[in-house]
Amino acid sequence: CTGISLTAKDGSYVQARTIEWAYGAVLKSEYVVIPRGERLRSYTPSGDDGLQFSAKYGVVGLSVEVKEFIAEGINEAGLSAGLFFFPGYGGYEPFDATRSDVTLADMQVVQWMLTQFASIDELIASIDGVRIVALVDSAVLHWRIGEQSGRQVVMEIVGGKPRFYENRVGVLTNAPGFEWH
C-alpha cells in the first residue's frame, strides 16, 4: 500500500492511498459509518472484550475483513487515519489478559483514533493510556494520521513503545519504517 498527500495552490489538502494485497487474500472491504455516541469495543487475542469506548466523533471509512477494522477513514473534525502493513520492523506489547480493559487490537487503532480525537496532539497525549496488541502475530502495522491543516504524522510501535514522526514528505508505504522514507 502507498499513502500520499497533496496540498494545492489554494491551500486545500487531500490524502489518498492505494491498497494492494497479495497472498491471494480477499479483503472483504466495505464502507463503514460510525455515528457519534455509538458504543464500541476492541477485540483481544483471547476472545474476551478489550477496551470499551463511545464514539465522540462521527466517522466514515473503508474496512478490511470486518467493519471494525478500518483501513482508512476520516472523522467529522477532519482527522484522518490509515493503517499500513509493517512486518519485520515493529513490535507490540505482549497481550496481558489482566489488562484487557485498556487493550486495543492493532486492526482497530484507526477506529479508536477517529472516534476519540479531533487532533494529532490529542492522540499523542492519550496513546499511553492504551496497550496496542496484535490479533495475528504476523500482521504488524504502522499508521498515518492527518489533520485538515495538512499536518501529518506516522505512528510506529517498536519494542512495545509508540513513536511518532512528523511526516513532512506526505508519503508512507508499507515496510520499511518511516525513517527510511
Please identify what each model-predicted range represents.
Residues 1-98, 137:
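A contiguous strand-loop segment
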Residues 7-9, 99-131:
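Alpha/propeptide regions of enzymes that mature by internal proteolysis
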Residues 28-31, 38-42, 99, 105-108, ...:
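Glycine-rich loops and low-complexity Gly/Arg-rich segments
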Residues 83, 118, 143-144:
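Noncatalytic scaffold domains of N-terminal-nucleophile
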Residues 122-144, 151:
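Secretory/export targeting leaders with adjacent low-complexity proregions
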